[in-house]
């Protein structure tokens, strides 16, 4: 524990004051796909209980935002319908 604590204490956050942040790029890649930010839509089962469009709504939102949608095997409509709703990458 002591070594862990000493190692953690050795880290320091060094704020960079007066640095131009007018053009920040938080994009990254995941499995070869470019993401706008390093945030992805987690698979959620039974989305149709929240919105009638279910997985289609999430797939469209993920595509519009520029991220990846992980699709649950228990959501509706079918995986094929969700895949057809957008040509943006999806992960099952």
Regions found by a protein language model. Give the residues of each.
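Surface-exposed amphipathic alpha-helices with a cationic face
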Residues: 5, 9, 59-63, 83-84
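Short alpha-helix boundary/capping motifs
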Residues: 32, 89-90
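Glycine-rich phosphate/pyrophosphate-binding beta-alpha loops
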Residues: 43-49
């Amino acid at each position: 524990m002591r070594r862990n604590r000493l190692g953690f204490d050795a880290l320091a956050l060094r704020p960079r004051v007066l640095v131009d942040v007018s053009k920040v790029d938080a994009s990254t890649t995941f499995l070869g796909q470019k993401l706008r930010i390093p945030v992805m839509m987690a698979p959620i089962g039974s989305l149709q209980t929240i919105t009638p469009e279910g997985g289609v709504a999430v797939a469209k939102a993920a595509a519009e935002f520029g991220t990846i949608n992980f699709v649950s095997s228990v959501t509706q409509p079918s995986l094929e319908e969700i895949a057809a709703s957008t040509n943006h990458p999806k992960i099952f």
